[in-house]
């Protein structure tokens, strides 16, 4: 396996493929190492991924800053302080530690090196790699592209409205010893600002905006633009005149999804597959989690005994890609709608999920892009109809009232990751679920529903489920089904068999 790119997505894939017994070559183009990065925010879900990769010891010495509050001006012009359960990590040290771990476990690493071309056919690729010592030819079963955002324009990408991000760092000495280290997020009429203390003691400030809406040539005047944004901000005004460690940097930050993320034997990971809006601050976790899903799909594809199993692997990969991207785009749009300055053009243009491509209707890629668009729209429609939890406690389960499976519950077969493979697995589908559910609390769900196809008392159902789970778990399952309206009151003798 050849993995191209040693960011969180590529490193996660290389380590997981190694765990599954594959020989892995990791190719990284950066000449300087550890390389500086701006994606330092780690959301709590990263911990489970690190546990799965058995990488806790390797990351023990990586500088991290956690437990700092967030000062926020978003839904109104009033500033509020909220708890923050994420962390900020030294990304250069984080990536370097995972590279050392991969090498220690037998992953071959080429750096600096770059992918030149790929010839051959799926499952039998001839990969040409440029190194400091010349061209290298490598035979590979599969190629995983984790190179992140590319400067070239990819026509097969569906893009959200354009975004760019400017950033700079303030030295600790400039802010003084008593300066707070809180994260700051501020909505402005023409964009939003984010700031966070780094483990090094520096403070990073970022301004995200739409360059197409500006007439002040931001690419030519980045310092002026960033200082003016600080001056207009209630949370960053005090930083507008402070010295910076270096001149501001600027990068593209437009969210997108790639319609060609899966090709037989060649898959994309992380930002190469889909890029999140930076407002989420969850790019590292999403990149690593999707890499794990992609590895399971690719492992299944490589070890499949027939074309049906390979097709199932692809279906799993693409469904997870669409689900992850659609949920993020929908969440981002909802968050943009909450901004106190939401009537300005910048915010209105991002208040609903909107993706476009630059393809002509007769382009050869148009069909793939159209299929992806329909899949995303279907996912958005499902997200829209599923009601979020109200936050109120659900009524107690009536133990001596008959219940049954709701008539609009269905049993469907979906691609599901079990262990290190993708299999076709029965799952429960219902309008109040945002996706079919195959497992509940680690137990296959559909076999547990058989007793609910006819009217029954919860107290009896808890007893009948005792062979599969503890009584307390059985009760929680019934309460969850009732909270989702997947079970309903039933008259004696009523029947409600789900359809398949």
Language-model features: where?
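Glycine-rich FAD pyrophosphate-binding loop
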Residues: 18-38
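Short capping segments at the starts of secondary-structure elements
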Residues: 449-460
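C-terminal helical "tail/cap" subdomain of flavin- and related membrane-associated enzymes
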Residues: 299-394
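FAD/FMN-dependent oxidoreductases across multiple families
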Residues: 215-303, 308-333, 339-341
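Acidic, low-complexity/disordered tracts enriched in E/D and polar residues
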Residues: 367-451, 475, 479, 488-500
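Beta1/beta-strand and adjacent pyrophosphate-binding region of the FAD-binding site
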Residues: 1-9
